[in-house]
Amino acid sequence: MANTKVEIRVDTTASKEVYVCGSTKSLGAWDPKHAVKLEQVSATTFSVSKLMATGEVVEFKVLSGKSWDNVEKGSYGEEIQNHLLTPSKGLVEVVEVAKFNK
């Protein structure tokens, strides 16, 4: 299966460091110790580009540190579902994060 470059962009004011951890090896294989740090590109936007298998559904969470203690939360502190993406050429996945657990 061919690979394609996917950009994950996170918009948040809730953290100075942002990581993604997900279902593929390129996103840490659900091990937060291997979570991928995003680069801060503006005051509230973080971004990373990764090669992923085209057409394979990928799940991920956003973290404010390399621990599940730092996982993203909803606006009221509630748990949220995993983000899903299906890599395709030129895909830019934009996620807004209101809060983190810590």
Identify the role of each PLM range.
Residues N3, R9-G55, G65-S88:
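Aromatic-rich carbohydrate-binding modules that target alpha-glucans
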Residues E56-F60:
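Exposed beta-strand face motif in extracellular beta-rich ectodomains
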Residues G90-K102:
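Compositionally biased low-complexity segments at domain edges in trafficked proteins
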